[in-house]
Amino acid sequence: MPSLRSRFFVFLLRHRHLLRFKLKRRNNIDRDTPVQQLRDEVERSAGFFGKLPEGFTVTPVSIHGISAEWLMPPDTPKEKAILYFHGGGLVIGSAKAHRGIVAKFVKGSGVGALVFDYGLAPEHPFPDGLNDSVSAYQYMLDEGIKPENIVFMGDSGGGNLCFATLLALKEQNIPLPAGAVTLSAWTDLKNTGESFITNAESDNLCWRDAQEIFRAYYCGDNDPGMPQISPLYGDLHGLPPLLLYAGSDELLRDDTTRLAARARDAGVDVTLHVGEGMFHCYPACAPLFPEATEAMNEICEFVRRRLNEIPYPVPNSPLNPLSNL
């Protein structure tokens, strides 16, 4: 059963329009909705996920014209790192807006992260974002970071690019990273999962109309069933160990559960967590309720183990770095 704190949090999510003195839960999104307006809203709400811990540094870099930044904890070399694919339906979001989220993973795992601003649709439809993602990984390799010292991580639309990049790297015979973590990855842009229908009302963060519009922006004239657009339909053999999260009540739940099943059938080491009563990308909300904190701890331990770091402290340990976030 979901914790009392998580249920209260979900209640606030569902009724947050009332806190803004609005009667309507949400505004419909269609092709007439200004994309920049949606992006501005994301940037304004970024602070909700927390601020950078003391001593963290943000170092901007340019990767063949792609804006990116290193997010580093104090006194940490770049020998091992996370490559983070930010979410936002492939249309909104940014590295800057995700600093608070990524900082939690960085703090808990003890390694830095490279976060990059891949090209967003509709200005940059497929394959621009995927090409930028491959370039970001190649940049890390060119910087001398070994593949076995890199873990991919992505949320929502960034989870899509995380898997699509793995497939592209495999096709190009580029060594794969040590592992990958996704939160509520959008793996099927055909939107055929049962949860896309059954959870349309229970999902308080993702909306079917928005997903359809974002899909059209990203795919352009391309078939949404192409494996590098919808990794669910790709050849998953040979992928590194995966740690996957989804909420039971979210629109994209089945995008994760179906990919997990197909990856296992392909012989991939998969750990799947479907949080009961949870919502889209719920681990990013740590430490606001127990389920998110537990997931965050598991993710950080996975990163440390894949990178052969010291095992992460058990939940509720006095050494738990999330206790100070």
What annotation goes with each model-predicted range?
Residues T59-L325:
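Alpha/beta-hydrolase superfamily serine-hydrolase fold, recognizing
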Residues M1-L71, N308-L325:
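A glycine/proline-hinged amphipathic helix-loop "lid/cap" segment
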